[in-house]
């Protein structure tokens, strides 16, 4: 049985750095979030994010197909429920690098998940 590990914290707290280090372990796989924002020129669908339309995202919300979701800067971000269920069936550690609101939603649906909250070393960071 797999494990869900949530890494959350404010911008600059080191979430991405920690996740990149953990991903070096072959038993660790990072979740790919879904978003309605437009891809940046260097981004490919399915690598950093799964890019979907606002209509598709809102339909997934209505159908309960997202484990967590939030709106940030006018775009939706979320994690598909089926991705988490599939990860739990495997012998892997599934990392979710998400903001606090999303972490709380995941913890409600998957209380066995491990949640790690990172804080930057000081207010300047």
Segments predicted by a language model, with ranges:
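The feature captures the helix immediately C-terminal to the Walker
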Residues: 19-20
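ATP-dependent small-molecule kinase phosphotransfer cores
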Residues: 35-94, 100-104
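Hydrophobic anchor at the beta1->P-loop junction of P-loop NTPases
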Residues: 7
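Post-Walker A helix-loop "phosphate-sensing" segment adjacent to the P-loop in P-loop NTPases
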Residues: 23-32
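P-loop (Walker A) phosphate-binding loop of NTP-binding proteins
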Residues: 10
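Conserved phosphate-donor/acceptor-positioning beta-strand/loop module used by diverse small-molecule
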Residues: 94-99, 109-125
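Walker A/P-loop
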Residues: 16
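ATP-binding Walker
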Residues: 13
């Amino acid at each position: 049985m797999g494990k869900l590990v949530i890494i959350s914290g404010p911008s600059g707290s080191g979430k991405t750095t920690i996740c990149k280090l953990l991903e070096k372990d072959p038993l660790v796989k990072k979740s790919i979030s879904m978003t309605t924002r437009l891809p940046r020129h260097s981004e490919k669908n399915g690598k950093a994010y799964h890019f979907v339309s606002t209509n598709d995202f809102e339909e997934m919300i209505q159908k309960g197909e997202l484990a967590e979701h939030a709106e940030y800067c006018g775009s939706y971000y979320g994690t598909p429920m089926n991705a988490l269920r599939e990860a739990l069936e495997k012998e892997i550690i599934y990392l979710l690098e998400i903001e606090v609101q999303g972490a709380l939603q995941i913890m409600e649906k998957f209380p066995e998940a491990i949640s790690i909250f990172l804080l930057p070393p000081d207010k300047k960071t």
